[in-house]
Amino acid sequence: MAPKRTADGRRRKRGQKTEDNKVARHEESVADDFEDEKQKPRRKSSFPKVSQGKRKRGCSDPGDPTNGAAKKKVAKATAKSKNLKVLKEEALSDGDDFRDSPADCKKAKKHPKSKVVDQGTDEDDSEDDWEEVEELTEPVLDMGENSATSPSDMPVKAVEIEIETPQQAKERERSEKIKMEFETYLRRMMKRFNKEVQENMHKVHLLCLLASGFYRNSICRQPDLLAIGLSIIPIRFTKVPLQDRDAYYLSNLVKWFIGTFTVNADLSASEQDDLQTTLERRIAIYSARDNEELVHIFLLILRALQLLTRLVLSLQPIPLKSAVTKGRKSSKETSVEGPGGSSELSSNSPESHNKPTTSRRIKEEETLSEGRGKATARGKRGTGTAGSRQRRKPSCSEGEEAEQKVQGRPHARKRRVAAKVSYKEESESDGAGSGSDFEPSSGEGQHSSDEDCEPGPRKQKRASAPQRTKAGSKSASKTQRGSQCEPSSFPEASSSSSGCKRGKKVSSGAEEMADRKPAGVDQWLEVYCEPQAKWVCVDCVHGVVGQPVACYKYATKPMTYVVGIDSDGWVRDVTQRYDPAWMTATRKCRVDAEWWAETLRPYRSLLTEREKKEDQEFQAKHLDQPLPTSISTYKNHPLYALKRHLLKFQAIYPETAAVLGYCRGEAVYSRDCVHTLHSRDTWLKQARVVRLGEVPYKMVKGFSNRARKARLSEPQLHDHNDLGLYGHWQTEEYQPPIAVDGKVPRNEFGNVYLFLPSMMPVGCVQMTLPNLNRVARKLGIDCVQAITGFDFHGGYCHPVTDGYIVCEEFRDVLLAAWENEQAIIEKKEKEKKEKRALGNWKLLVRGLLIRERLKLRYGAKSEAAAPHAAGGGLSSDEEEGTSSQAEAARVLAASWPQNREDPEQKSEYTKMTRKRRAAEASHLFPFEKL
């Protein structure tokens, strides 16, 4: 019998044994030899020599010396066959044997022979040196794996191995690259399209809001309403002259208005009545339905007092940027700031109840699968892994044990254990205050009640945000295993608790619900005070005069577009007066400044001096503000700039510009010191040239085709800055050349640059007549193309031409010659057209003649000549009666062969002479004579 092994895979040595124990042990081994062979795990390596000798000796009887030799031979053959069978079964069962080396197979084949040779020498020592130990059984799971890999499951077909050649790898990489680039292109086009749609919607909504403001402003300047408003104003306000109506006067007027008019939301509002009728009714009862009507009434009173007043509107269009990116950002904040947010959201879905898998359980399953794969690769040579598998418990039991440990020792490292094991206490104590930040967490087992959902007193400090994030990812999913809290207890807990987490964010929907605040006062008034010569804001809803900060406080956020409309309909953008974040965040949320300025251009006031003073007021207000403390704020700032934010074609001039301050050690310069530089060619397009002797103020790397080819030809110039840039202070106006002796001055390319009208050569004119160069060439007059710009397409720069440049003295001559040339061309075109029409008519007539001739020769003549031979025409009745007969005759003639001639006609042809026949055939075409 083979020696047994312990659970840890090692053999235990022992002293000498008595003969009685040996004999008893051998008798038991003879009976259980085959059973032990089946039950013990198969091993890939060969058995030791001592065990092989002991196995064979256990099959014989030591007390019978007569049959020793015969039994040895039988035992030898039996052991050899058993070992071969075991090796075959190992080859079929072990998943790793297909990858064994040939040396291992040879070693396995030679194993029985070496066993027989060493049998006699080691059989006595093996019994005395080794002790038999009870063997641990394999797990049922491993036996199932061995049974699953039976010989019947082995692949029958041959294994095909495909090797990718380098050429195929290049083709595959190329196709994948093309596919990836195409997907990127489609993604960019979709994003661009969505961006354009969102921007157009923003513009349309903005225009609609602006049109609504125009309508309300026009209603508030109706003479009837102004008369009604003037009738209710006390006399003390009307007696004050216009030059004395300052901010103090406006404050008293606002106090009287607030004390006189009230806001009553219960007033009826009829959809059939227009705004004018509604305002008349509201003034009659000294009450308004909302703040909007209150502002309109006060606007009527101010305009009735002959005060220059603006209706200021804070427009709230749809966002310029899509809300998709905002939703993604909020979801990220949810996963970071709210550690239990993902688990709480998933616990509400039905899938979360069916799949309560935790992160620890997933890790343990991965470890278990790796352990199984390693055990299969080893051929199950050891039982230590099996024992560890049996001792491994499910993840649910580990979680329960951990929770029990926490409950058993609540004061020992309480914060750390609570953060790692269960997030329930923290979520109940911190996040149960509001419905948007709280989700009912699960309890342990089936013992959930209303008390579990109610927030308890806080016993420990709230950990910092990173710690909560790390702890929540491990423990938040554990709270899903139990049953959910009852829905009836959720509103009570949310309404009763007050200590909710402000920094915790659950979902984007919760953020939107939290951000929904009542709309503010988005309209107020501005009055121009003559004594101060400035516009003063008036908020009649809150009784505020001359406080732009208060108007911003009560308005709806964000404040992006604030426009003022005066009594004449002129519009002014006054966002800079009210929005404190105008220079940083607000400008990024607005539409393109050029489009907005172009939109308001038709409504710009004619009082330019007053607008200039207002612009200076805005500039002074911005300069009074302190320097920004964040470096990112200086990027594209309208007042300040840093050197790090300068673009490729920008520079600070002069070099000794004044430093306004420092931000984290970097000098802050005024935006007026930032200038845009250009190359010589670019300045020439603006009709300016670089002065002689000027040195480039900045050198950069050019990216024109010529510059790139030059760098490719010489590798040492790869990083060389070859393009010189010049500032406006280094240039002068372009001086056009003078035409001499009827010759137009040209550039090095044989053309004339005419980017601006001021670049016209002296003594020359531009004539935009097509094909003028051909007329000038015939007359011998100099004519040059005019280059007005360049168009970039197809990867290259193409010149754009517009007419020709000629000397001024040849203008009339060329014009007359060109007109004469056009008349000749028109005459030729007319003659060509007439000739073509005449040829078409000739062809048509000739075809008709041929058709009639063919009809006379081959057509049916009997039915066509019958009505004429009878003489005279038929009546209408006769025509109707004979129509059927004529149709039958026509069908008969069409069905009968037409290539047969009448006998009379055939006799006439035979009597005709050759001359007569030739004369008759003289007018025929050659193909008709055949």
UniProtKB/Swiss-Prot annotation:
Low complexity compositional bias, start-end: 342-351, 486-500
Motif Nuclear localization signal: chain residues: 388-393
Protein name: DNA repair protein complementing XP-C cells homolog
Subunit structure, interactors included: Component of the XPC complex composed of XPC, RAD23B and CETN2. Interacts with RAD23A; the interaction is suggesting the existence of a functional equivalent variant XPC complex. Interacts with TDG; the interaction is demonstrated using the XPC:RAD23B dimer. Interacts with SMUG1; the interaction is demonstrated using the XPC:RAD23B dimer. Interacts with DDB2. Interacts with CCNH, GTF2H1 and ERCC3. Interacts with E2F1 and KAT2A; leading to KAT2A recruitment to promoters and subsequent acetylation of histones.
Primary location recorded for the protein, binned into one broad class: nucleus
Polar residues bias locations: 466-485
Keyword Transcription regulation: yes
Subcellular localization(s) per the UniProt record: Nucleus; Chromosome; Cytoplasm
Biased composition (Acidic residues): 120-134
Signal peptide: none
Species name: Mus musculus (Mouse)
Modified residues (Phosphothreonine): 165
Keywords: Chromosome, Cytoplasm, DNA damage, DNA repair, DNA-binding, Isopeptide bond, Nucleus, Phosphoprotein, Transcription, Transcription regulation, Ubl conjugation
Molecular functions per Gene Ontology: damaged DNA binding; DNA damage sensor activity; protein-containing complex binding; RNA polymerase II-specific DNA-binding transcription factor binding; single-stranded DNA binding; transcription coactivator activity
Lineage: Eukaryota, Metazoa, Chordata, Craniata, Vertebrata
Phosphoserine: modified positions: 93, 126, 395, 397, 875-876, 883, 895
Cross-link annotation Glycyl lysine isopeptide (Lys-Gly) (interchain with G-Cter in SUMO2), location: 40, 80, 88, 157
Sequence segments annotated as region (Interaction with RAD23B): 489-727
Spans annotated as Disordered: 1-134, 323-517, 867-930
Location of region: Minimal sensor domain involved in damage recognition: 600-759
Biological process according to GO: DNA damage response; DNA repair; mitotic intra-S DNA damage checkpoint signaling; negative regulation of gluconeogenesis; nucleotide-excision repair; positive regulation of DNA-templated transcription; pyrimidine dimer repair by nucleotide-excision repair; regulation of mitotic cell cycle phase transition
Coiled coil: none
UniProt region (Interaction with ERCC2 and GTF2H1), positions on chain: 809-930
Segments for region (Interaction with CETN2): 840-859
Chain's role: Involved in global genome nucleotide excision repair (GG-NER) by acting as damage sensing and DNA-binding factor component of the XPC complex. Has only a low DNA repair activity by itself which is stimulated by RAD23B and RAD23A. Has a preference to bind DNA containing a short single-stranded segment but not to damaged oligonucleotides. In absence of DNA repair, the XPC complex also acts as a transcription coactivator: XPC interacts with the DNA-binding transcription factor E2F1 at a subset of promoters to recruit KAT2A and histone acetyltransferase complexes (HAT). KAT2A recruitment specifically promotes acetylation of histone variant H2A.Z.1/H2A.Z, but not H2A.Z.2/H2A.V, thereby promoting expression of target genes.
Ranges of compositional bias, category Basic residues: 40-57, 408-418
